[in-house]
């Protein structure tokens, strides 16, 4: 297919609306007073806490910014969809230790979901706990977590992530119990690996990948075109898809995403 124009990006009409309100404040004290005034009304709105935290950080008070950010976890302690979003933002801010704690909490709340284990393993890697990460991966491949119906939906990603973990940290790892196919790995040609994650099984969207030659392909995550896939996600508990772009060469790729969720 030939690419002619971009599809519209995922639209969120509430995007940064709280940030704009805080910008009207003249100093940090006013920002914090406004935050306290609005906090209770936004207790279940993680975006409010994150935007408030970001704005406070711009004033140079990192401790207060972190405290506000952590408030978003406290007020949404059992909502997995919101906790996933907060964990994404924590990783984005390179607060990997907090992201790990959130993913561990999600694992406690959703021990039957396949991605709960994968997310914890990846979070362990990001804080340098490579053996702990390997232990989780081994548990997946050795079928230790019998409470999970299946890990087939995340096998592609955990296979890539486990290989990378071992190749980079082999000398530091105890490989006892690791499946034999991971014991004699060799570095292979680099592929562009893109992983998309979302925080709700009901999210409907369309991805469009455009290569430097303006050729494109699409991937739909909608009930009308991919119902069996979405059923599998709910059954196994995963919210992600991995794409490997072979022969990527040089030049710019464009990735568009269009929101297909109704009533948003």
Model-derived features: positions:
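Canonical positions in the second alpha-helix
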Residues: 38, 71-72, 105-106, 140
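Intrinsic-disorder/low-complexity signal
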Residues: 165-264
